Protein backbone atom coordinates (compact mmCIF):
# COMPACT_ATOMS: atom_id res chain seq x y z
CA UNK A 1 0.00 0.00 0.00
CA UNK A 2 1.32 3.42 -0.93
CA UNK A 3 2.10 5.53 2.12
CA UNK A 4 0.96 9.14 2.30
CA UNK A 5 1.86 11.88 4.70
CA UNK A 6 -1.22 13.05 6.52
CA UNK A 7 -0.81 16.55 5.08
CA UNK A 8 -0.84 15.12 1.53
CA UNK A 9 -4.38 13.83 1.86
CA UNK A 10 -7.69 15.61 1.56
CA UNK A 11 -10.01 15.28 4.57
CA UNK A 12 -12.24 12.78 2.74
CA UNK A 13 -9.29 10.74 1.54
CA UNK A 14 -7.86 10.63 5.08
CA UNK A 15 -11.15 9.23 6.37
CA UNK A 16 -11.42 6.72 3.51
CA UNK A 17 -7.83 5.49 3.87
CA UNK A 18 -8.31 5.19 7.64
CA UNK A 19 -11.06 2.64 6.88
CA UNK A 20 -8.83 0.83 4.35
CA UNK A 21 -11.32 1.58 1.58
CA UNK A 22 -10.58 2.22 -2.08
CA UNK A 23 -12.26 4.98 -4.06
CA UNK A 24 -14.10 2.25 -5.93
CA UNK A 25 -15.44 0.71 -2.70
CA UNK A 26 -16.60 4.06 -1.33
CA UNK A 27 -18.18 4.95 -4.66
CA UNK A 28 -20.03 1.63 -4.79
CA UNK A 29 -21.33 2.13 -1.24
CA UNK A 30 -22.65 5.57 -2.18
CA UNK A 31 -23.88 4.68 -5.67
CA UNK A 32 -21.38 6.91 -7.47
CA UNK A 33 -18.38 6.21 -9.66
CA UNK A 34 -14.78 5.89 -8.56
CA UNK A 35 -14.06 9.02 -10.64
CA UNK A 36 -16.68 10.96 -8.67
CA UNK A 37 -14.96 10.05 -5.39
CA UNK A 38 -11.62 11.02 -6.93
CA UNK A 39 -13.05 14.39 -7.97
CA UNK A 40 -14.39 15.01 -4.46
CA UNK A 41 -11.05 14.15 -2.87
CA UNK A 42 -9.09 16.37 -5.23
CA UNK A 43 -11.50 19.27 -4.82
CA UNK A 44 -12.45 19.23 -8.52
CA UNK A 45 -16.11 18.86 -7.59
CA UNK A 46 -18.28 19.32 -4.53
CA UNK A 47 -20.29 16.36 -3.23
CA UNK A 48 -24.02 16.70 -3.76
CA UNK A 49 -25.36 13.83 -1.69
CA UNK A 50 -28.92 12.71 -1.20
CA UNK A 51 -30.00 12.19 2.42
CA UNK A 52 -29.63 8.43 1.92
CA UNK A 53 -26.11 8.82 0.51
CA UNK A 54 -25.20 11.19 3.34
CA UNK A 55 -26.28 8.65 5.98
CA UNK A 56 -24.43 5.90 4.12
CA UNK A 57 -21.25 8.01 3.99
CA UNK A 58 -21.34 8.50 7.75
CA UNK A 59 -21.96 4.78 8.27
CA UNK A 60 -19.25 3.43 5.97
CA UNK A 61 -16.65 5.91 7.26
CA UNK A 62 -17.82 5.24 10.84
CA UNK A 63 -18.02 8.93 11.70
CA UNK A 64 -20.58 11.33 13.12
CA UNK A 65 -21.91 14.44 11.42
CA UNK A 66 -19.59 16.52 13.61
CA UNK A 67 -16.55 14.55 12.40
CA UNK A 68 -17.38 15.09 8.72
CA UNK A 69 -15.13 17.77 7.22
CA UNK A 70 -16.89 20.90 6.00
CA UNK A 71 -14.93 20.57 2.79
CA UNK A 72 -14.02 17.14 1.43
CA UNK A 73 -11.25 18.22 -0.93
CA UNK A 74 -8.31 20.50 -0.40
CA UNK A 75 -9.05 23.95 0.99
CA UNK A 76 -9.50 26.64 -1.62
CA UNK A 77 -6.92 29.42 -1.91
CA UNK A 78 -9.41 31.80 -0.29
CA UNK A 79 -9.47 29.61 2.83
CA UNK A 80 -5.74 30.02 3.33
Model-identified regions with their sequence ranges:
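Short, basic-rich loop-to-helix N-cap that marks the start of a DNA-contacting helix
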Residues: 44-58
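Short, charged recognition helix plus adjacent turn
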Residues: 2, 59, 66-80
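Short coil turns linking two alpha-helices in DNA-binding domains
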Residues: 22, 33-36, 64
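Conserved hydrophobic/aromatic packing and binding residues within compact polymer-binding modules
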Residues: 12, 26-27, 37-40
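Residues within the helices of the helix-turn-helix
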Residues: 13, 24, 55
Amino acid sequence: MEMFKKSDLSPLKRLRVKRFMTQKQLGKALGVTEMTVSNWESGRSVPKLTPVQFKKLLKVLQITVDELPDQFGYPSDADG
